[in-house]
From Swiss-Prot:
Organism: Bradyrhizobium sp. (strain BTAi1 / ATCC BAA-1182)
Encoding gene (name): gatA
Any one Gene Ontology cellular component term annotated for this protein: glutamyl-tRNA(Gln) amidotransferase complex
Family: Belongs to the amidase family. GatA subfamily.
Task of the protein: Allows the formation of correctly charged Gln-tRNA(Gln) through the transamidation of misacylated Glu-tRNA(Gln) in organisms which lack glutaminyl-tRNA synthetase. The reaction takes place in the presence of glutamine and ATP through an activated gamma-phospho-Glu-tRNA(Gln).
Name of protein: Glutamyl-tRNA(Gln) amidotransferase subunit A
Subunit text: Heterotrimer of A, B and C subunits.
Length: 491
């Protein structure tokens, strides 16, 4: 039998339907792969007993002809999603051994459709990071290495565990979240496909909040088709999330293979950065050529406020984070470090519970929201955000169907190589992705090539609100032209 872990989700679904193998066999193959890949540190909690029980239930349903769209498919869940009776920590000490008594909407929809949970995946603490180095469980290793080197690289962040596990064939797909690039950047670093849907497309209920007006859940998968299948189950209106949008969920998979002839693809001139590596330039130009060869029309567009996106993002996101994280005080749940007074209890708990990056962002957020600086920083950043959104609206009003950009300014870097003394160096990783969150638009990262050291590089497509289907159609064109990339196993 083929190694079951090498199948795509779509192929596994066919195999299960034709009874070529069972969900239990598929699940066991992935559990074995997880055991062998512990060096990657992708999973922070493995749930083998639960996985096997869910697989048996899926097999019974398949046998009765009652299979859901994801029946028997083993998935990994980012540790930001609340999972009933399974520890959920956001990879922070402050949540300790918190075990939710409820299930997030996104994961409950995956279980409704028959998926199997393999365990919880590592991420940057409270999703704050671009390299998966801020987790209290330690950094995640990227399955990819530079040719001829033994240096362990980062998988990107904050959804580094999700991207690493999918790239290393430990799960058939994974949930992830994206606040400023946390799905698309790790996908680009690991040669996986990651889509950040339109804000409001997937419910945020039961997901640990970082920046509520920017956070959005989405899948990381092995192919555009797999990502489309997963997004259909994850998306949908949820009355429990006031920002969830009541728009019917289309069959995203039907968009795979759809003609892109006549589509207008915008190439934004502001994304041509000074000192951009020639490899990234070439990748971008290759992507444009592939879309043109498929019948799309390329047009240069202008997004004039792009250069203000990163500074505005690093005001808005920490401001919302400082408000959201105020609930972690050691009183009701999670870590509790006692003190002589309530103030001391808060101080001691937060000092011990929050890692340095989270503390930094909470302090930035508290500063920009303080009385003397609120107008100068926070209000101005929100005005910039409106201008960024307007740039995209103007572009789409001219008939542009999607915008093509690089996903990241470089390939993956080594653990500990960036951001030590200067956090801004790490923040610059999100330069191509934050605009999409600021405008609430959908964006997909698709593997498109390799750099001179054999590391994967990705391209990003940005779409109109709630037009993820076009992104899947265009993404699949790039995927077919570039081919599939798999890492050489070292773990």
């Amino acid at each position: 039998m083929t190694d079951l872990t090498s199948l795509t989700l779509a192929e596994a679904r066919k195999g299960l339907a034709s009874k070529t193998f069972t969900s239990l066999e598929l699940t066991d193959a992935h559990l074995k792969a997880m055991e062998e890949a512990r060096a990657l540190n992708a999973f922070v909690m493995e749930t083998p007993d639960q996985a096997r029980a869910m697989a048996r239930e899926a097999d019974a349903r398949i046998g009765k002809g009652e299979a859901g769209p994801l029946a028997g498919i083993p998935l990994g869940i980012k540790d930001l999603f609340a999972t009933k009776d399974v520890r959920t920590t956001a990879c922070s000490k402050i949540l300790g051994n918190f075990v939710p008594t409820y299930e997030s909407t996104v994961t409950s929809q995956l279980w409704r459709d028959g998926a199997v949970m393999l365990g919880k995946l590592n991420n940057d603490e409270f999703a704050m990071g671009s390299s998966n180095e801020t987790s209290c469980f330690g950094p995640v290793g990227n399955p990819w290495r530079r040719e001829g080197s033994n240096t362990t690289l980062v998988p990107g962040g904050s959804s580094g565990g999700s991207a690493s596990a999918v790239a290393a064939l430990l799960c058939m797909g994974a949930t992830a979240t994206d606040t400023g690039g946390s799905i698309r950047q790790p996908a680009a670093f690991t040669a996986t496909v990651g889509i950040k849907p339109t804000y409001g497309r997937c419910s945020r209920w039961g997901i640990v909040a970082f920046a509520s007006s920017l956070d959005q859940a989405g899948p990381i998968a092995r192919s555009t088709r797999d990502a489309a299948i997963l997004l259909r189950s994850m998306a949908g209106h949820d009355p429990k999330d006031t920002t969830s949008v009541d728009i019917p969920v289309p069959d995203y998979e039907a968009a795979i293979g759809r003609s892109v002839k006549g589509m207008k693809i915008g190439i934004p001139r502001e994304y041509r950065l000074d000192g951009m590596p020639a490899e990234i330039e070439k990748l971008w130009s290759d992507g444009a050529d592939w879309l043109k060869a498929a019948g799309a029309e390329l047009v240069e567009v202008s997004l004039p406020h792009t250069k203000y996106a990163l500074p505005a993002y690093y005001i808005v996101a920490p401001a919302e984070a400082s408000s959201n994280l105020a609930r972690y005080d050691g009183v009701r749940y999670g870590l509790r470090v006692s003190g002589k007074s309530i103030g001391e209890l808060y101080e001691n708990t937060r000092a011990e519970g929050f890692g340095p990056e989270v503390r930094r962002r909470v302090m930035i957020g508290t500063y920009v929201l303080s009385a003397g600086y609120y107008d100068a920083y926070y209000i101005r950043a929100q005005k910039v955000r409106t201008l960024i959104k307007r740039d995209f609206e103007d572009c789409f009003a001219k008939g542009v169907n999607a915008i093509l950009t690089p996903a990241t300014p470089s390939a993956a870097f080594g653990i500990g190589e960036k951001g030590g003394a200067d956090p801004v160096e790490m923040y610059l990783n999100d330069i191509f992705t934050v605009t999409v969150n600021m405008a609430g638009l959908p964006g997909i990262a698709v593997p498109a090539g390799k750099d001179s050291q054999g590391l994967p590089l990705g391209l990003q497509l940005i779409g109109r609100p709630f037009d993820e289907e076009t992104l899947f159609s265009l993404g699949e064109v790039i995927e077919q032209a570039a081919g599939r990339f798999t890492p050489v196993r070292w773990w």
